[in-house]
Swiss-Prot record:
Domain notes: The cysteine framework is V (CC-CC).
Protein modification: Contains 2 disulfide bonds that can be either 'C1-C3, C2-C4' or 'C1-C4, C2-C3', since these disulfide connectivities have been observed for conotoxins with cysteine framework V (for examples, see AC P0DQQ7 and AC P81755).
Family that this chain belongs to: Belongs to the conotoxin T superfamily.
Lineage: Eukaryota, Metazoa, Spiralia, Lophotrochozoa, Mollusca
Name recorded for this polypeptide: Conotoxin ar5d
């Protein structure tokens, strides 16, 4: 749910 937005997976 928005992991790239939260910069946890990107």
């Amino acid at each position: 749910d928005g992991c790239c937005i939260a910069k946890q997976c990107c």
